[in-house]
Curated annotation (Swiss-Prot):
Main localization, broad class: endoplasmic reticulum
Induction / repression: Expression is controlled by the monacolin K cluster transcription regulator mokH.
EC number: 1.14.14.124, 1.14.14.125
Application of this enzyme or protein: Monacoline K acts as an inhibitor of HMG-CoA reductase involved in cholesterogenesis. Its hypocholesterolemic activity might be useful for lowering cholesterol levels in the blood and reduce artherosclerosis and coronary heart disease.
Similarity remark: Belongs to the cytochrome P450 family.
Classification via CDD domains: CYP503A1-like (cd11041)
Pfam families the record matches: p450 (PF00067)
InterPro entries: Cyt_P450 (IPR001128), Cyt_P450_E_grp-IV (IPR002403), Cyt_P450_sf (IPR036396)
Name of the protein in its database record: Dihydromonacolin L monooxygenase mokC
Lineage start: Eukaryota, Fungi, Dikarya, Ascomycota, Pezizomycotina
Function: Cytochrome P450 monooxygenase; part of the gene cluster that mediates the biosynthesis of monakolin K, also known as lovastatin, and which acts as a potent competitive inhibitor of HMG-CoA reductase. Monakolin K biosynthesis is performed in two stages. The first stage is catalyzed by the nonaketide synthase mokA, which belongs to type I polyketide synthases and catalyzes the iterative nine-step formation of the polyketide.
Residues that, per the record, bind heme: C467
Length: 524
């Protein structure tokens, strides 16, 4: 007997829905989804009646298009070039269609007013664009909790504990570099991007979770790849209507991978947390001072003061923030130095003198002024994002020049001032001594340091919207580069130009980046 096609179709739909309900029983019924979809349409109609931005949209939807998909894809592919082209000639804001909707991008001249506006929320951006309400995005759920525990730990503990972790961090970096880069004294081509990424992953995790997990290959794999999986899944979900995302994320392979990584991270971390808590309770019961560990597990416990927090989510968020941004600046800094070989010996002399006399301390890292200047210049020439400090408007916002941003829309600041010839002489030129000279001026010495921010250099954002982990990243990068420059000779691979990976707001060193290297007969 032949079964009608429509009957088969209905059965398949029923089976598919049953499978979804089995794996996600909390999902709403089909009737609820239809009702929700109609409500969404109604809300969209009501929202469209509100005041709109009168700014020009650079990549508008064509009149015949039903969706903004083409515009979003074109922004993903062309955003850095578009933003640079517009703001190099115009000191006026502009609107774009990005993967999460409309985004008003402001010129850097408006950054000072922007950064002070409490109506513009970075946490809202992180929670919305990285789907903090969905399983697998547990790191962003912890980041956006009202307690803001992660921000407190990064801003307070990573600063006050620097004297305790700098030397252990240097020792870990030294051993890791020997393991990854080896002792080959012949010139050879090295996949420097991949090797530096592994180096950063291992040194970051050493401070984040301590010695035991920092040498656990399974944890290192999660730390290294979870951020990539999360970024891919977040981007894919942003292309779907909001109401469908709670369903779609259960059906996509990246979503399953993301949730598996979180589950395994919990399984690896939880025994260590419980062991330390039991150890502390036992010591206190015996009137003994509990041991204190120099890692962020300890600092989260101290800062939480007994209040619940998601320990695994916190650590995954720290890895997301601390590995790839740090790697990009470190690799970019190394490549720029190698592209200007006359820099290598002055840098080695500085490292020998400072570290040789004072050892590994926060104070000695501060004195690596040429290395600091090189890194800040690398960040100026190639910022990691072409527009930064993204935030959502919690209410309608009007800037002093009349620029209007509707409630619920995204706002960012272009990095145009970092390449403005009126601010920086010869802005296209990599000048490694640029910020070293500025440090000689008492009025500019503070902002000329890598870890400090101002309106002329927003590579780390601008306080209070600056990257809170920049102080730790600065120390870590200097330690790693000091070892790499002293231990190895470097040169460019012939006929292999430097490449960047440009996608949406990001401008990053290409993963295929390679350099030539060989071991030297010197060490720190």
């Amino acid at each position: 007997m032949t079964v009608p096609t429509d009957t088969v179709s209905r059965r398949l739909q029923s089976l598919a829905w049953s499978d979804i309900k089995q794996h996600a029983p909390w999902l709403p019924s089909s009737r609820t989804l239809v009702s929700g979809f109609l409500c969404l349409i109604l809300l969209q109609i009501l929202y469209s009646r509100g005041r709109k931005s009168d700014l020009r949209v650079y990549n508008p939807k064509k009149w015949w298009e039903l969706t903004t998909m083409r515009a979003k894809r074109e922004f993903d592919a062309n955003a850095p070039a578009w933003i640079e082209a517009w703001f190099s000639k115009n000191d006026q804001p502009l609107r774009f269609i990005v993967d999460s909707g409309y985004c008003t991008i402001l010129p850097s001249s408006m950054a000072d007013e922007f950064r002070k506006m409490k109506e513009l929320c970075m946490y809202k951006f992180l929670g919305t664009d990285f789907h903090s309400h969905l399983p697998g995005f547990d790191g962003f759920k912890e980041v956006t909790r009202d307690a803001h525990l992660i921000t407190k730990v990064v801003m307070n503990q990573f600063q006050t504990q620097a004297a305790k972790y700098t030397k252990p961090l240097a020792d870990e970096a030294s051993a890791t570099i020997a393991d990854i880069f080896g002792d080959n004294k012949e010139w050879h081509t090295a996949p420097v991007y991949n090797e530096c990424l592994d180096l950063v992953t291992r040194t970051v995790t050493f401070i984040m979770v301590g010695d035991k997990l920092a040498h656990n290959e399974e944890w290192l794999d999660i730390a290294k790849h979870h951020a990539v999986t999360m970024a891919i899944q977040a981007r894919q979900l942003r292309l779907w209507p909001v109401i469908l995302r709670p369903i779609v994320h259960w059906l996509e392979p990246q979503g399953a991978k993301l949730r598996a990584q979180v589950r395994r991270a919990r399984q690896l971390l939880e025994p260590i947390i419980q062991e330390r808590r039991a150890e502390k309770a036992k010591c206190l019961a015996q009137g003994i001072e509990p041991p204190r560990y120099v890692d962020s597990i300890q600092w989260f416990e101290d800062t939480a003061k007994g209040q619940w927090y998601d320990a695994a989510g916190a650590q995954l968020a720290m890895d997301f923030a601390g590995i790839y941004g740090t790697s990009d600046l470190m690799i970019g800094g190394l490549v720029d130095i190698v592209r200007h070989p006359h820099l290598i010996e002055p840098l080695r002399n500085e490292i020998r003198t400072v570290i040789g006399e004072e050892g590994w301390t926060p104070a000695s890292l501060y004195k690596l002024k040429l290395l600091d200047s090189c890194l800040k210049e690398s960040q100026r020439v190639k910022p990691v994002e072409c527009a930064t400090m993204r935030s959502y408007a919690l209410q309608n916002v009007t800037f002093s020049n009349g620029t209007f941003v509707p409630k619920g829309e995204l706002v960012a600041v272009a990095a145009d001032r970092m390449s403005n010839p009126e601010v920086w002489p010869e802005p296209k030129k990599y000048d490694p001594y640029r910020y070293m000279r500025l440090r000689e001026d008492p009025d500019k010495a503070f902002s000329a340091q890598l870890e400090n921010t101002n309106g002329n250099h927003i590579g780390f954002g601008w306080h209070p919207r600056a990257c809170p982990g920049r102080f730790f990243a600065s120390k870590e990068i200097k330690i790693m580069l000091a070892f790499l420059l002293i231990r190895y000779d470097w040169k460019l691979v012939p006929n292999e130009p430097l490449q960047y990976y440009r996608h949406s707001f990001s401008v990053r060193i290409h993963p295929a980046t390679k350099l030539m290297m060989r071991r030297r007969d010197e060490d720190l």
